[in-house]
């Protein structure tokens, strides 16, 4: 059970890692390329041997673990915006897992794999492709997630596409979290164990 909870917490950190970047880009209009690449790469790992295979960049994942500590810990500085994005992603994931869009999602991700023969994962064309997958396959499943931020940045096409690409990454981690048995009630009843794992992971 302990190993499963470790893996589940890793996937949950993956969700928050992506959501944290969404918030940063919406507010500041820029992104850290390494963190962006780390999140986008998780979308491409569709048949992992282990959860760890999905998150090759452990340094980037630390940002997700830190958000777990911030959001689930005893601090009064919980970020309601991060919580709102998380609730939206988990709601869309439920609809995805219950519908028949998984096949289309896999097909579209294969197109990105082919595209990467010619471009890097943070290239504009690739990000636009990820964004298109989110718009066409995920966003249509339920209510759109309303992103808050600086209106000057939010109206820029490149910012919009990075945000959608990162929401797709958050969705990928949400699917994995659910596959590992993740349920929203665990965030309440297993909160201390999840926090312990997150804190331990930050010191490794």
From Swiss-Prot:
It is a peripheral membrane protein. GO terms for cellular component: cytoplasm; plasma membrane. Keywords: Cell inner membrane, Cell membrane, Cytoplasm, Membrane. Pfam families: DUF489 (PF04356). Transmembrane segments: none annotated. InterPro entries: HflD, HflD-like_sf. It comes from the Bacteria. It is found in: Cytoplasm; Cell inner membrane. Belongs to the HflD family. This is High frequency lysogenization protein HflD homolog. It comes from Shewanella woodyi (strain ATCC 51908 / MS32). The gene is hflD.
């Amino acid at each position: 059970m302990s190993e499963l909870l470790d893996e589940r917490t890793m996937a949950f950190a993956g969700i928050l890692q992506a959501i944290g970047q969404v918030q940063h880009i919406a507010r500041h209009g820029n992104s850290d390329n390494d963190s962006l690449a780390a999140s986008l790469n998780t979308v491409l790992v569709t048949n992992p041997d282990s959860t760890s295979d999905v998150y090759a960049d452990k340094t980037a994942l630390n940002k997700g673990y830190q958000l777990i500590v911030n959001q689930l810990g005893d601090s009064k500085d919980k970020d309601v915006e991060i919580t709102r994005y998380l609730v939206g992603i988990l709601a869309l994931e439920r609809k995805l897992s219950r519908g028949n869009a998984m096949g289309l999602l896999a097909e579209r991700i294969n197109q990105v794999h082919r595209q990467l023969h010619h471009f890097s994962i943070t290239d504009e064309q690739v990000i636009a492709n990820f964004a298109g997958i989110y718009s066409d396959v995920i966003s249509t499943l339920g209510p759109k997630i309303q992103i808050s931020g600086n209106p000057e940045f939010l109206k820029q096409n490149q910012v919009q596409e990075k945000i959608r690409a990162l929401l797709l990454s958050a969705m990928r981690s949400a699917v994995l979290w659910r596959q590992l048995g993740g349920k929203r009630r665990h965030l309440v009843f297993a909160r201390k164990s999840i926090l312990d794992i997150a804190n331990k992971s930050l010191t490794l």
